[in-house]
Swiss-Prot record:
Residues 2-135 form the HTH marR-type domain. SMART domains: HTH_MARR. This is Transcriptional regulator SlyA. Transcription regulator that can specifically activate or repress expression of target genes. The keyword Ribosomal protein does not apply. InterPro entries: HTH_MarR-typ (IPR000835), MarR/SlyA-like (IPR039422), Tscrpt_reg_MarR-type_CS (IPR023187), Tscrpt_reg_SlyA (IPR023071), WH-like_DNA-bd_sf (IPR036388), WH_DNA-bd_sf (IPR036390). The gene is slyA. Keywords: Activator, DNA-binding, Repressor, Transcription, Transcription regulation. It comes from Blochmanniella floridana. Belongs to the SlyA family.
Amino acid sequence: MESSLGSDLARLVRIWRALIDYRLKPLKLTQTHWITLHNIYQLPPDQSQIQLAKAIGIEQPSLVRTLDQLESKGLIVRNICSNDRRAKRITLTELAKPVINQVNQVINVTRNEVFYGLRVEEIQQLNNIIAKLERNIINLYNKT
């Protein structure tokens, strides 16, 4: 019996991302913007683009376009690193902090609505299963 779990999970991620994009539209932001801002906010100050790309789990060229957009919105600044002129350090602007709070509010409301009807134990169990699947996949990558 073939499982459609992989396809189901991929579809779930797509529609969840689309819902977040829709709800962030009034703020003129996307889910990709949120993930990037959230990671910049969570990481130690003045991360390089390379470090940020690794933290998010994407390639640096993919990140550059998003950073360009966030910079044009006045939410981040990129400065050349004094130790390595090829590297750029990313810093949130003062304008970003209230925007991050607004975005987090939208994300939290959306998450609560998505999880409506699920018990806390079910959500914890789902998180545990996802973590196990992720570990298995990472282990498979490490074997090759």
